[in-house]
């Protein structure tokens, strides 16, 4: 997809500043669904220790070496190390609904806290290529509940209508 002319690489990097405000001092971060790697690189530039995870290297604009791990979220590789924070933007809505709880459980097993940005509307690009790219379109309350199964404190930071910014603190680890 990233090689298709006109395809948007996603909004991940635009959320780095907001997420960094919650993350604070340099720490360990896993960028779940890193896409181009722009957000991961931005966190590295801020001094964070970052691992980038995605189902494909195709969209990467940076060479993360062994800091890139090819993996799906619902079958998260054992090679993904633990980290203090997760960062997951424009990813969860792309999963089939039945994979969402599984992926969240796997993610909560790797990080203590996670910043999410999730779209609550159908994607605009999919119809151009005859595909549905946002497979899980749900209201903010649904996302808060499903994330809340895996994290102790879940907060809706911002609901701009189509996009929900969610902070998840304290992974329960048992899921």
What is each PLM-predicted segment?
Residues 1-82, 87, 98-104, 130-142, ...:
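Conserved N-terminal segment of class I S-adenosyl-L-methionine
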Residues 57, 121-123:
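Short, glycine/serine-rich, charged loops/turns that create anion-binding
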Residues 64, 110-111:
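Residues at helix C-cap/C′ positions in short coil/turn segments immediately following an alpha-helix
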Residues 91:
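Hydrophobic adenine-recognition pocket in adenosine-nucleotide-binding enzymes
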Residues 94-95:
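A short His-aromatic
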Residues 107:
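Class I S-adenosylmethionine-dependent transferase superfamily signal
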Residues 111-120:
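Conserved beta-strand signature within the Rossmann-like core of class I S-adenosyl-L-methionine
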Residues 123-130:
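A short acidic, helix-capping loop that chelates divalent metal ions and anchors anionic groups
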